[in-house]
C-alpha cells in the first residue's frame, strides 16, 4: 500500500498511521490537471467559506482577467461554463488551494502555461502566503529552485535532499539540467533583446 521504506512523519505522526480523514486535514494536493466545478469563479475558490475571493485571485495574478469577464467573479466556469485556458484553470485551482491551505501542500507544476513574469510574481505571492506551511513544489522550472529551502532529487527509488547548491555538487544530472535551462533562458533573453533593438531601429 505504501511504496516506500522508512517513515514519513507529519507533525510527529507517521503518515501510515493516519486515517484518510486525518491525512486530508493535514495534506493538500493540487494535481497537474485540476478539476473546476460547474459554478462561479468565486464559488470555485471559496467552496462556501465566508472569505474574500479577491485576495486569492490577486495571489494568482488573475484579478484583472476575472474583472474583464462578463459577470466578473460570478462568471460560471467548469464543464459547461465559460471556457478557461489551461493556465487560467490552473491558477483558479491554485487560488482554491491557497484559500483552503493545509499544513502540508503538494503542488504539481502549478506554473505551467504561464509567461515568465506572471510565473515569478505568483511564485513570490505563493512564498508569502505559505510562510507557515510546508510546500512540496513539483516543477520543471529549475530556475526557481535556488530559492527553495531544500531540493529533493528522486531516481531509481532513492531520494537525495539538500540545498540547491548541495544537489548541484552531489548530482551531475541535476547540474546538467540546471545549466541547460540556464543557457536556454539566456539565449531566449538575447533573442528578445535583439528583436526589440531591430524593432526600434525600424521605427526610426
Which role does the model predict for each range below?
Residues 3-4, 9, 63-92, 101, ...:
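ABC-fold ATPase nucleotide-binding domain signature/coupling loops
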Residues 72, 124, 128-131, 137, ...:
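C-terminal portion of ABC ATPase nucleotide-binding domains
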Residues 6-13, 23:
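Conserved ABC transporter NBD signature motif
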Residues 102-103, 133:
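A residue-level structural signal marking coil residues immediately N-terminal to beta-strands
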Residues 115-125:
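Conserved D-loop/post-Walker B switch-helix segment of ABC ATPase nucleotide-binding domains
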Residues 21, 25-32, 134-136:
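ABC nucleotide-binding domain signature
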Residues 34-76, 101, 117-118, 173-176:
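Conserved "ABC signature" C-loop
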Amino acid at each position: 500500500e505504501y511504496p516506500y521504506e522508512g517513515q514519513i512523519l507529519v507533525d510527529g505522526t507517521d503518515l501510515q498511521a493516519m486515517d484518510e480523514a486525518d491525512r486530508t486535514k493535514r495534506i493538500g494536493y493540487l494535481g497537474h490537471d485540476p478539476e473546476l466545478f460547474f459554478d462561479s469563479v468565486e464559488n470555485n475558490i471559496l467552496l462556501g467559506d465566508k472569505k474574500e475571493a479577491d485576495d486569492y485571485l490577486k495571489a494568482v495574478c488573475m484579478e484583472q482577467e476575472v474583472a474583464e469577464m462578463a459577470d466578473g467573479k460570478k462568471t460560471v466556469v467548469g464543464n459547461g461554463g465559460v471556457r478557461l485556458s489551461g493556465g487560467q484553470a490552473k491558477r483558479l485551482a491554485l487560488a482554491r488551494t491557497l484559500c483552503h491551505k493545509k499544513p502540508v501542500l503538494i503542488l504539481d507544476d502549478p506554473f505551467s502555461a504561464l509567461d515568465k513574469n506572471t510565473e515569478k510574481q505568483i511564485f513570490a505571492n505563493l512564498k508569502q502566503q505559505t510562510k507557515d506551511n510546508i510546500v512540496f513544489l513539483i516543477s520543471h522550472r529549475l530556475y526557481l529552485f535556488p530559492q527553495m529551502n531544500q531540493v529533493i532529487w528522486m531516481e531509481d527509488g532513492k531520494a537525495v535532499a539538500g540545498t540547491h547548491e548541495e544537489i548541484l555538487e552531489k548530482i551531475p544530472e541535476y547540474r546538467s539540467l540546471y545549466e541547460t535551462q540556464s543557457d536556454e533562458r539566456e539565449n531566449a533573453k538575447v533573442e528578445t533583446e535583439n528583436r526589440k533593438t531591430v524593432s526600434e531601429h525600424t521605427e526610426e
